[in-house]
């Protein structure tokens, strides 16, 4: 309800109560763009119906919950939501959203009733650490095809949308 109200009013008041980290920055930027263009991007829609949730087994904080949504009413792809809780007495806040394009492959999660251990930004055993992936992808989003990391990532819809919005604003 808070995000819908913010989108409808094109106002960022109250977003920090529900969003944090990169998602707060992204949604704040989307509303700033909407204030200039007159409408919020349809890609800002976050489906409310949940297909799967992975609860953490970690006993400490911060904690993260991973949720996969259903498709939107206008048939946009599912989303992977990452919600974080900084302490036991704070509510979870939406930290990140990733659109899951058709054919996207996710690592296997532990049985949802059991939960999964939280990874770290420096976990190895993947193509690159999560920290390296974020740094490199941010460089690609900033510099497009001129990024030294452009070959490491597919030319996805997010890159195309950001490039298009950058040209329009």
Predicted stretch roles:
Residues 1-35, 109-169:
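Core segments of small alpha/beta cavity-forming domains
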Residues 63, 73-135:
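Short beta-strand edge/turn micro-motifs at domain boundaries
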Residues 34-79, 169:
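Surface-exposed, charged secondary-structure patches
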């Amino acid at each position: 309800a808070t995000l819908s109200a913010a989108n409808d009013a094109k106002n960022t008041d109250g977003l920090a109560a529900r969003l944090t980290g990169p998602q707060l920055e992204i949604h704040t930027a989307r509303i700033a763009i909407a204030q200039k263009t007159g409408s919020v991007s349809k890609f800002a829609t976050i489906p409310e119906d949940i297909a799967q949730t992975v609860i953490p087994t970690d006993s400490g904080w911060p904690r993260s919950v991973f949720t996969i949504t259903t498709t939107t009413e206008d048939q946009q792809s599912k989303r992977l939501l990452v919600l974080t809780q900084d302490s036991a007495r704070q509510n979870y806040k939406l930290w990140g959203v990733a659109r899951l394009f058709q054919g996207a492959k996710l690592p296997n999660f532990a049985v949802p009733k059991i939960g999964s251990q939280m990874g770290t930004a420096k976990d190895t055993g993947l193509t690159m650490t999560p920290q390296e992936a974020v740094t490199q992808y941010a460089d690609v989003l900033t510099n497009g095809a001129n990024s030294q990391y452009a070959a490491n990532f597919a030319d996805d819809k997010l890159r195309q949308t950001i490039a298009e919005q950058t040209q329009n604003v």
